[in-house]
């Protein structure tokens, strides 16, 4: 009897150990499936949208970006007065580029690392656990002259891969952003590692169309930020 109990305990411990080993892979697979569903729902909503409505959403985003540039507002100085000044026809940041109710404003694709993630408003934990967060106070990721969108992503979560492989990107690589029917391709021009407080220098440059991808580094330490700078080529 004692031997049977020990055998059962050994089996249970083995199964528990196997579960611990498999958890990251299984959890990541489930999270990727969720991300695919969110992107598919976004694509369907966009496809069913009238062209007039689609054009209006993009026009609002373009106007928001123009206001940012004209007023010289950056994310590190974003207070209530600045948010008020950035209203577009009474709409706040969170109400712009809403194709459907999930809060997805578009999606990011990086072919080199086989990544496809939804882009959400803001950089809350909820947003970063499910995809990429757009930093409020930076240009919305719809392209255009004198724009600089900043997108954040987590790295090394046990439940999802997200930006874990972002450090594999090199100068000359490309990534793509799709917002409604606007498809934008960016080429990596530079990579940097900075302290968190050094992000304040990321502002729009005259006549340039830029996006910076941001994640924590070194892996597992997270004391600095890895910046992948891209400039639009298509």
Question: Language-model segments: what does each one mean?
Answer:
Residues 14-234:
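Solvent-exposed, non-transmembrane regions of membrane-associated and secreted proteins
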Residues 1-14:
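N-terminal Sec-pathway targeting helices
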